[in-house]
Amino acid sequence: LTMAYYDNGNEILTDYGASRFLNIEAKNKGHYTRENESFAKQTIAHNTLVVDETSNFGGDIKVSSRYHSDIIYSDFNGDHFQVMVAKETNAYSGVEMKRTLVYVTTPFLQFPLILDVLQANSDKEHQYDYPLWYNGHFVSLNFPYTKASNGLQTLGTKNGYQHLWL
């Protein structure tokens, strides 16, 4: 249940899982990046939910190829309102995910609104991580912060987390 968002051909939510298809000439005419296995193929590289720091379907493409998400509802006919709802029950054992994406335009706002609601249900407790790879610039915060300049640590040791810094 991933999400991609473009504005006039410009990628706003980057899918780093597509890194093997980017900058083909710079990568010796299509060779994969070194991070292809350790990051790009991992669920954390996509704009979707990660459960217990593991890639969906156990990272096994043969298993994932046997399943697909189910569309629950969609309506793309409105001029100012479009919606898509889908669910996934096979990506993680015992976890059901449902994602609702809504695109809304209104004369009161200069730019459209995108609502992204992702629900996860399970009978067991899990750690949920929800990365959104925004292709933008940090401008300001309304609270003080300290910039990390040394002693950075990785968020984890495998499944792409070794490429993320705290």
Regions found by a protein language model. Give the residues of each.
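Glycine-rich (often Gly-Gly/Gly-Pro-rich) flexible segments and glycine-rich loop motifs
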Residues: 46, 148-166
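Catalytic and substrate-binding regions of extracellular carbohydrate-active enzymes
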Residues: 1-151
